[in-house]
Amino acid sequence: MIYQLLTKNKGLISVLAKGIKSKKDYTSLKPFRELKISYIAKDKLSLLTYYEILDDYKNITNTFYLAGIYFNELIYKFVPQQEPSQNIFSLYKDHIIYMSKTSDSIDMVFFKFEILFLKEIGYEITLNNLNKNSIDLNKKYYYDYEVGFKEVQNKIDLKNSINGDDLVFYLNNKLFLIKNIKTFRVIIKNIFQRLSGGTKIKSYDLF
């Protein structure tokens, strides 16, 4: 059985787990478990020799479990193999802990991960020439995928536009005050699709 593991010091690695035959082993190596591992490093496919469960985050609900599948797909698509990234590891771990405890909406859980993940891979949502002081709370803004947010000037730009007050809440990291998280998430979805050459993020459509 081949597993993809996100590690703190080596990034995303592929390991071959020989001898994983029992139901207990399969259960132990389910997604979203923090493991202590030993492995023999190989160029392409390392050999897993030992694992120990440190935390199984068993309080994660089924809905958030599906959200984790989406996060896994993003990491698999956009994080290169064997490229160390402690920030990505910490983001993922912190979010798994968060999902095991929170009563937030599923959109909020997605949104928090997405904006931080985009920042970590170098594609943070940008403002073009706008700044917080120049944003009119009563106007609408659309996202130009080449330069960032711009003020809406015509009807075409109204599609997937953001109210000025929501944009300011986003910039001030007051995410719980944003009324239209879904439109922000459509923008983020489009960014991911552009980064993947138009390929769909399959698990996005689970919700």
Residue ranges and their predicted role:
Residues M1, L6-F207:
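Non-catalytic alpha-helical scaffolds and adjoining flexible linkers that form interface surfaces
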